[in-house]
Amino acid sequence: MSVWISLIGIGEEGLDGLAPALKTLIDDADVLVGGERHLAKVPGGDAERLGYDNGFGAGLDEIESRRDRKVVVLASGDPMNYGIGAMLSRRFGIDDMEIHPAPGAFSLAAARMGWSLPDCETLTVHGRPADVLNLHMSPGTRLLVLCRDGDSPAEAAALLSERGYGDSQVTVLEHLGGDNENRF
């Protein structure tokens, strides 16, 4: 089987951050799959649109039913790092797809903090309970935590305090790589 799924990582800058060849893949797609915020970054076009804001697993059958078409799946940043890339490759096989990652949240956050990624613990509480952080808290550890919403940083800070790390510096970064990038 030839490649029929193109998995494209996009950043906050949307289409402006993509190489021309990736924009062409999106323009030529028969089916465009993504979360609401991903699809909103691609205005217009004639492609059928499939959203997956309520969980991606159920969308796999929808994608499978379009095997005879050019399918582009949009994801945040690097879809192979806590993203949907592994789920897609397990289901469809790497021979059916091509993966085009963009800089992910961890790379961008490490760059903003001036930290080397190998010197950090990278974790996500997106779709996971915040107490997963407990396994990684130790003196001097640098944690880069991908959060699910605006409440997650406060939950992480509360866990730090409960574990005796109340003096830790917590930096919140949002909309990395976009016009609304912010640091708190």
Model regions and ranges:
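A short alpha->loop->secondary-structure connector
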Residues: F92-M97, W115-D119, R163-S168
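Short, well-ordered alpha-helices that flank and scaffold nucleotide-derived cofactor binding pockets
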Residues: A86, R90, A111, A158, ...
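A contiguous loop/helix-start segment that scaffolds small-molecule binding in enzyme catalytic cores
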Residues: S2-L7, P20-K23, R69-V71, S138-F184
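Class I S-adenosyl-L-methionine
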Residues: M1-L108, H126-M137
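Flexible, glycine/proline-enriched loop segments at strand-loop-helix junctions
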Residues: D96, D119-T124, G140-R148
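Generic detector of solvent-exposed, compositionally biased contiguous segments
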Residues: A110-R128
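Acidic/polar active-site rim loop that often engages polyanionic ligands
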Residues: R90, W115-P118, H136-R142
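Glycine-rich, charge-decorated loop segments at or immediately adjacent to ligand/cofactor-binding or catalytic sites
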Residues: S107-W115, N180-F184
